[in-house]
Structures are given as C-alpha cells and as structure tokens.
Amino acid sequence: MNFEVCKQLVAYARSIEKEKGKNFRFTLTTNGIGITDEVIEWANKECYNVVLSLDGRKEVNDRFRKDIAGRGSYDRIVPKFQQLVKARGGKGYYMRGTFTHYNTDFTNDLFHMADDLGFDELSMEPVVSKAGSPEALTEADLPILFDQYELLAKDMLRREKAGHPITFYHYMIDLAHGPCIYKRISGCGSGTEYMAVTPWGDLYPCHQFVGDPDYKLGDIWNGVTNTELRDEFKLCNVYARPDCKDCWARLYCAGGCAANALHATGDIHGVYEYGCEVFRKRIECALMIKVAESLDPELAGRAATAAPATDEDCGDCSSCE
C-alpha cells in the first residue's frame, strides 16, 4: 500500500471540493498486509467505504493470497480487518472475496466470515481465468454455483427473520428507485468516467487493463491522448451488444464487464456468457428475497427500514433535475 500517495491524493481532493462544487467520496481497497493503526484512523475519517480482500476460510484464502515469501496471509490480515471494522463504528465496508473451481462451495466461506469472524457486509465474485487454468470455473460447476446462490438467499432470509441479517452485495436490488437509465446501460463507465492510474502515472480504462499497451489512454501529465480508444469505450454499453437484446437482466448488468468480455471474446463489446449465467442467477435470487420479504409482514417491515437510498442524485447529468 502506497499510503503516502493515498493521503496526499485525498488531501488534494478535499482542498478543491468547494472550489469545484464537488463532494468527493473515497473507497480504500486493501489486502490487509499494510494496515496499521494510522491507516485505520485515516480510512475511518476519510473513506466513504473500505473493501477488505479475504477469500474466506484459511485454506481457501491462503491458496492464492500469499506474501512475497510465499506464506499465506490469513492469520495476519484477519485481526487487522476485525480491528478496522470495529473502529469504523457502522460506516460502510465490504469483505470482498473471489471463489474459484477449488471452492465452488463458496457459501461456506461467506458463512465463515459471518459466523466465525463477525463480518456482516459481504461480497464474493467468481474468478475470471483463462479456460483450462486449474482455478477456472467450468460448465460443470454452474449447477453447483446456482445451488449455492439459492442456499445463500434462503439463509439470508433465515438470518433476517432471526434478527441477525447479513448483506450480500450482489443481492442488493432496489425495485422502487435505482439508478437513472444512463447508469443502467453504461455500468461502471470504464474508460470514460472511470480510469486506473498506475504508480508511473499512466491511465487505463480500469485496473484490469493495466500493462496492456493497446489499452493505454494517456498519462496524468498529458491527459487522455488516445481519444479513439476513449470513444470506443463510450459506445461500450448494453445496447451495443446484440447478444444482450433479449436478456431480461440487461438493465441490471448494463452489458457486463468490458475487461471480462475482452478476456473471454477478444472484444470489449463481446459478451462473457459464463458471467451472464452467474449474473442472472444472482438477480433471480435477489428478486426471490424481495418477494419473500413482501409476503412476510415481519420481513417486509424490516426490509422497508433497511432499504438503501439509491435514488440519490449522482450529479453526472441533468436527467434527474
């Protein structure tokens, strides 16, 4: 973690907020190795959210999350994560993991984080790897993953009814409000509204493109110089993908991840079909939870109380005025 750069960046943004008429919100993502008391104090003061990388059970996490000496990180990072979350005093955070072919029973990793470690804001993403890689998810894994998502949804309802709810990022869905149509079709806005900055000052559409010279947008000294690439990303939306035309979930995924599409199809306008299958299942389960809550008076009351305020004006366009 380049903590000095983090501090300087946030301090600079704060110094120009009033002048620019902006409200900057920062999220710190960390694997936990570099967390200190100073980092915790700073993050809890300056960061709207923190994302803490943990793949779940010790043996699962330590399979891939190792330090430079090849040692697993679990035993060192978990106490730091617990300290940070406790110090946040209710401010936003997410435990963010990745599941692979090695742990298609990923609900056990989520339940471990919730029941054994005390975390209740959870996220777990499927790995995106080259086909044939040992960790890559396979077609045979899909039915298992679907069962896991259903198991998770049912367990979340059980926990909610017992008064000990957990949040799963991918089941958060607001059917009453939600984002404007621009956000619904353009997703994360990689390459236009969203960029990755390398330690050397280079600009890329997002962190997954870093190091690929074909996807370098420019640098912090000269700005965006590859305007042709930027314009290509401007057109990277759900309506630019013919395969999305008849998908019922298209306005929830906005066409999916450009980087995943590139890695799967060789084209940022392509469709990563495996990811589509997983995404549709997650939305299906999110809808199932909403229906179950609406049919249970006790759950309906709690759901209304906990409903996220997603209709906040993002300030990106005039359509909300």
Predicted segments — roles?
Residues 188-191:
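Short, small/polar residue-rich loop motifs at catalytic or cofactor-binding pockets
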Residues 179-185:
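Short, flexible cytosolic linker that couples an ABC transmembrane/permease module to its adjacent nucleotide-binding
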Residues 2-127:
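Radical SAM/AdoMet-radical enzyme domain recognition
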Residues 200-202, 239-321:
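Radical SAM enzyme core and accessory elements
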Residues 1-2, 30, 34-36, 60, ...:
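Flexible loop/turn segments at secondary-structure boundaries
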Residues 144-177, 207-254:
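C-terminal accessory region of radical SAM enzymes
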Residues 59-64, 121-143, 165-179, 208-214:
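Flexible glycine/acidic-rich beta-alpha junction loops that bind and position SAM and/or redox cofactors
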